[in-house]
A protein has these predicted regions:
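Extreme N-terminal "head/tail" segments of very large remodeling/mechanoenzyme assemblies
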Residues: 1-203
């Protein structure tokens, strides 16, 4: 049985703007009107990673605000979403020099099961000429073994939307790397190396 993880206590999610740096951590990717046809962050999600079971974040006009007391997990959550979900660089996970964050730590902190698979993802949308939108979703899958003290990651990019066109879990169990590749099919790619993933995202 998979141990239940949850959103860190005392953290409130809002898709709005606020400049109170003492209580808020924010991602701001809003574009100017002249650049409105560019991809803009629309949603992000964490599935079975760190203290999360499943959590979706909706951006308002490209902005995301997390409110909470010091130590509630705002900075760690933002670092998991950006930039880590975009480049797969594990060194980006360390919020401060006081605490080094590894993939193994993310998957085993507060979790006592034998093994765990989870996902971190972000979704971008941009308007199309016909009044619709074009989607781009990318993210990282992580597998950890508590008994062997190991963790590995893979990365993916697709034109499909999580929860709309496909799911990252099957009957509550996060997909394996191989199963994800099957689900994405010709509409996406799965990368073993973070460098190849980063190059693809940067195109």
């Amino acid at each position: 049985a998979r141990a239940h993880a949850r959103m860190p206590d005392t953290m409130e999610i809002q898709a709005t703007a606020n400049d109170d740096a003492t209580t808020n951590s924010a991602i701001d990717t809003a574009t100017t009107p002249a650049a409105s046809a560019r991809f803009r962050l629309h949603r992000a999600g964490i599935l079975n990673v760190w203290q999360y079971d499943t959590q979706e974040f909706t951006f308002g006009e490209g902005r995301l605000l997390l409110r909470g007391a010091n130590g509630a997990g705002k900075s760690k959550t933002l670092e998991m979403l950006l930039p880590f979900a975009l480049d797969g660089d594990k060194s980006r996970l360390t919020a401060s020099a006081k605490h080094h964050t590894s993939l193994l730590w993310l998957m085993t902190d507060g979790y006592d099961g034998p093994g765990r698979v989870g996902y971190i993802w972000v979704e971008f949308l941009r308007p199309t000429a016909d009044g619709g939108h074009e989607a781009f979703t990318c993210g990282v899958g992580i597998r950890a073994s508590g008994s062997q003290r190991t963790a590995s990651a893979w990365h993916f990019a697709t034109s499909k939307r999580v929860g709309v066109d496909f799911a990252l879990d099957d009957d509550g169990s996060p997909l394996s790397r191989g199963r994800l590749a099957e689900v994405l099919g010709e509409d996406g790619q799965v990368f073993e190396r973070a460098t190849a993933y980063k190059e693809h995202i940067g195109r």
